[in-house]
Amino acid sequence: MAFMRKAAVYLGLVEDDEERYEDYDDYDDAEPHRREPREAVERDLGSRRTAVVRRMDARESSPADPAELRRVSEPAPTERPTPPLRVTTLHPRTYNEARAIGEHFREGIPVIMNLTEMDDADAKRLVDFAAGLTFGLRGSIERITSKVFLLSPRNVEVTAEDKRRMAEGGFFNQS
């Protein structure tokens, strides 16, 4: 409707509402004086209420006797027994088995991918999938041997000793 009204005003069919208002020359554009909040509070509370304020010295803020001091100790960290680290070793034969790798990794389980039984083209695709998976879930991927990779979730740290055992074949005999 505003468009129609503006068109009618332009064509001179109706009177413009803005022309009805007169300009006032004595209008002051300056901002009105604001009183300070403290002044307003003092004026409002002036006769009704008075408060007594006393400044506290540094001597008064600390206890006079060291025996009055109470020692607060931090609670000792409780060590939760960590469950034994479960590592899944998978020997995929086709790229279609990538889903199983992703599901185990998403659950927070380190995955060893043994790609020795795959052809090179599918192995490359699976390594690309694993790299994207570890990047997306903030994990890490490491090459153990030429066609064997370790995928570690972000909250799992595999020690150098474990990696050495994997390279020697200690984990590959589990499946």
From Swiss-Prot:
<dbReference type="GO" id="GO:0043093">
    <property type="term" value="P:FtsZ-dependent cytokinesis"/>
</dbReference>
<feature type="compositionally biased region" description="Basic and acidic residues">
    <location>
        <begin position="54"/>
        <end position="73"/>
    </location>
</feature>
<dbReference type="InterPro" id="IPR007561">
    <property type="entry name" value="Cell_div_SepF/SepF-rel"/>
</dbReference>
<dbReference type="InterPro" id="IPR023052">
    <property type="entry name" value="Cell_div_SepF"/>
</dbReference>
<comment type="subunit">
    <text>Homodimer. Interacts with FtsZ.</text>
</comment>
<keyword id="KW-0131">Cell cycle</keyword>
<protein>
    <recommendedName>
        <fullName>Cell division protein SepF</fullName>
    </recommendedName>
</protein>
<dbReference type="GO" id="GO:0005737">
    <property type="term" value="C:cytoplasm"/>
</dbReference>
<feature type="compositionally biased region" description="Acidic residues">
    <location>
        <begin position="20"/>
        <end position="29"/>
    </location>
</feature>
<comment type="function">
    <text>Cell division protein that is part of the divisome complex and is recruited early to the Z-ring. Probably stimulates Z-ring formation, perhaps through the cross-linking of FtsZ protofilaments. Its function overlaps with FtsA.</text>
</comment>
<feature type="compositionally biased region" description="Basic and acidic residues">
    <location>
        <begin position="30"/>
        <end position="47"/>
    </location>
</feature>
<keyword id="KW-0717">Septation</keyword>
<keyword id="KW-0963">Cytoplasm</keyword>
<dbReference type="GO" id="GO:0000917">
    <property type="term" value="P:division septum assembly"/>
</dbReference>
<comment type="similarity">
    <text>Belongs to the SepF family.</text>
</comment>
<keyword id="KW-0132">Cell division</keyword>
<feature type="region of interest" description="Disordered">
    <location>
        <begin position="20"/>
        <end position="88"/>
    </location>
</feature>
<dbReference type="Pfam" id="PF04472">
    <property type="entry name" value="SepF"/>
</dbReference>
<dbReference type="InterPro" id="IPR038594">
    <property type="entry name" value="SepF-like_sf"/>
</dbReference>
